[in-house]
Amino acid sequence: VSRFERLTVTMISDQAIAFQLYQNRELDEIDLNESTITTITSDPNNEYNSQLCEKRARPSAYAMHFNYQKNNADGTPDVNWNKAIANTAFRQCFYRGLNLKAWFSRYNKINPLKCENDYYTMKGLCYNTQGAEYTTLVAKEMGFDGEAYDGKTMIRLRSNNGDIADLKKQAMDELSAIGVTFPVHAAYHIIAGSTTALDTATVLKQCFTDSFGDDFIVLDIKTYVSS
């Protein structure tokens, strides 16, 4: 026996539209875009403040990969970037200095550092023949095995408190000597027409500014069209 006389399926293309539907009580739960989250969390008296909750994490892990042979739009090699990313000190600036806490807040505004993952897979996915979980083994090799979530500082930034002044100087000196010009531009592509993707990328761009300084590395937000 059918429980409903009519069922409506709504395809939502944008989180701003989803929020409007939530306000009209047409949706029970939604993800929020950056501007809406900021509006709600910045005002303790906002009517939706008490309705915020952590979203259950997806059983997956995401990773950023460097392109060591980047080409320009015309097909010619991006020599400036390719030289920069081949430099060890330059790459270590990402590892030891890029603070992504604000970016993680796009996915978990309440406890952003729960999104931190310094390993290639999510926790609990892989085990060796002795039953040891993969990420615990990697943490030991990286010197992280004594570190735990504290809700304040990313694990990989704790050894130097995110201070990369010496590494930055080293990278800039070494790269300037081989003709690299600054700032180095890092390209980050998002799907065209998505305000959610743009909000998230804009936060990431600010993370680059705060962590590196715009005199060193600048994130360029690029778009692609899904076919």
Give the ranges of each region predicted by the language model.
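Periplasmic binding protein-like
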Residues: 22, 27, 46, 210-227
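Append "and occasionally in soluble cytosolic enzymes with long acidic Gly/Pro-rich linkers
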Residues: 84-212
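Extracellular/periplasmic solute-recognition and catalytic clefts
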Residues: 8-74, 101, 105-107
